[in-house]
Amino acid sequence: MYPEQLVAPMKAELANAGFTELTTPEAVEAFMKKPGTSMIVINSVCGCAAGTARPGVRKSLEHSKLPAHLGTVFAGVDKEAVNKAREYTLPYPPSSPAIAVFKDGNLVHFVERHHIEGRSADMIATHLKMVYDEL
C-alpha cells in the first residue's frame, strides 16, 4: 500500500475534475447501481497514469457529451474497492491504469494499460470523446 501523502496529489487530479473517489467495495457497488452512463478510472502511481491517463481523461471532459457519473479507484491503495471495480470489468484481466465506461452498470468500453502506454494524453482524450459520442 502506498502512503497517503504520496497518492493524495494523484487522487486530487481526478477528484478536482469531478470524479467521486470510491474507496470501499460498498461505494463501488452504490456507484454502479446508478442509472445511465458511468466511467470508472482505475488510477495508479505509474508513469503512464501520470503522463497520459489522468491528463487524457481530464481533457476528454472538455466535450459536449459525457458520462453522467464519474468515479475513480486507486490501485495499490484502495485494494478492496479496486477488486470490486474489477469485477465489473470482467472478462478483462486486472489492469492499472485503466478506464471503464458503463451503461446501466454494464461494461461497454474498456481501455487497458497497454492501450494507454505509448499514447499521448491528446490521443486518449480523442479516443474517449469518440466513446462518449457512442453512448
Swiss-Prot record:
What InterPro entries would the database entry show?
BrxB/BrxA
Superkingdom per UniProt: Bacteria
Extract one GO BP annotation from the record.
Answer: cell redox homeostasis
Family note: Belongs to the bacilliredoxin family.
Q: Which PANTHER family match?
A: BACILLIREDOXIN BRXA, UPF0403 PROTEIN YQIW-RELATED
User: What name does this protein carry?
Assistant: Bacilliredoxin CHU_0972
- Which organism does this record belong to? Cytophaga hutchinsonii (strain ATCC 33406 / DSM 1761 / CIP 103989 / NBRC 15051 / NCIMB 9469 / D465)
